[in-house]
């Protein structure tokens, strides 16, 4: 009897699911939502960079002679006083990294500098843009 191969469902650290990459203004976005956020920021003359900096949340270290990689987080959009994360469908690691990122900002004295926004759709993006304009 022939054995059937079954696909194992990936559960650990899944990357972007069901996202459609886009290129707009020469920038390669990972999803349509990120492209929409960028277009809205640009339409409202709000200055923000796309994935400009990678924050090292936990530095690399050695454990029992084995190198452990640093844990990093790259926000989607960073402006002078705001950070926007466009999250269509969160993966399994997202909630932890977001908490560590907030902790990082707090401990580096940056929590007062940045207002954090997480958007999941166009409606939330539009509301986010409105709130940023009020800052």
Summary of predicted features, one role per range:
Residues 1-135:
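Electrostatic, structured charged patches in enzyme active sites and in nucleic-acid/phosphate-binding
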């Amino acid at each position: 009897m022939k054995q059937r191969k079954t696909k194992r469902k990936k559960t650990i650290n899944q990357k972007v699911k069901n996202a459609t990459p886009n290129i707009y203004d020469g920038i390669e976005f990972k999803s349509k939502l990120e492209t929409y956020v960028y277009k809205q920021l640009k339409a409202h003359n709000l200055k923000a960079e796309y994935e400009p900096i990678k924050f090292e949340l936990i530095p690399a270290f050695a454990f029992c002679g084995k190198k452990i990689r640093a844990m990093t987080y790259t926000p989607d959009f960073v402006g002078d006083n705001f950070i926007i994360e466009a999250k269509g469908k969160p993966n399994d690691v997202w909630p932890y990294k977001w908490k560590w990122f907030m902790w990082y900002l707090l401990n580096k004295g940056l929590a007062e500098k940045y207002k954090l926004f997480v958007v999941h759709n166009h409606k939330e993006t539009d509301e986010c843009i409105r709130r940023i304009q009020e800052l």
